[in-house]
Amino acid sequence: IVHGTNVEDGTLQGYLKMFNLPYVGCDVISSAVGMDKYVSKIILKENDIPVLDCKCFYKNEEIEDIVKEVEENIKYPVIVKPINLGSSVGIVVAKNSEELENAVDDAFTYARKILIEKAIENLKEVNCSVLGDYEECDASECEELEKTSDILSYEDKYISGGKKTGGAKQSMNAGVLKLPANISKEQKEKIQRLAKETFKTLGCTGVIRIDFLIDEETNKIYVNEVNTIPGCLSFHLWRETGVMYTDLLDKEIELALKRNREEQNMTFSFDTNVLEGYANGLQGGKGMKM
């Protein structure tokens, strides 16, 4: 279980898979998709899982054009995120065009592709973990990131300021985690259901954590981000359900071995002369009139 560049995005998983070695956690595809904030949102949206409206931009695009498109399609305030970084690195809130230009410029120092999405001003953030595979999975208890006096706003809750603004960047973890989350039974059940749907839609395996946003004005719930290798495997969320850390590790290993056995029994080659027959057909068809 590792964290960082090239080990959460499917790179390491692909390397291990080449040697037919079992490994815990998500496979190559789900790891890569989970790391790409835009791709994961598009897939979830296509499967009727609620996500915030967003746009993706590349480094070669003019900042003025980016600002114009955002103002026409998303509206302020917005969140600017590097597309494939974790731990809230490079995430900035923008409430006007000047802040957006600075935020975009800042985000492009971390990645060549960025995500810009609508910000919820009156939000509650809730996290939920999922454990299992494509056949069966369970959702954990839910936790809430409770805002303190230092992080009352959405901007402070994420990361405030960019490299040009001189603002102090604060971690999302500056808040206090409240376990269980202060949400209704209906909200909890919906979050757990959406968590499991997200898990299966992205083809995950093992333990992941999904971050949700609740709009307290509308009570709408959105999937925010997927963490395919959560810190400490989000054990504290499972402890609330009676799952011990050793049980969590055993289950991770069990699922890894199960997947490896299934892959070993798959057929990855198919002997056929279909291409040869196609080529012969082309040769035999020379000179034919249509």
Residue ranges and their predicted role:
Residues D48, V176, N182-M290:
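ATP-dependent carboxylate activation and anion-phosphoryl transfer catalytic cores
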Residues L12, D36, Q187, I191:
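Hydrophobic (often cysteine-bearing) scaffold residues that line and stabilize catalytic clefts
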Residues Y23, C54, V80, I116, ...:
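Generic preference for hydrophobic
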Residues H3-G4, S88, L145-T148, N227-R239:
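Glycine-rich phosphate/pyrophosphate-binding beta-alpha loops
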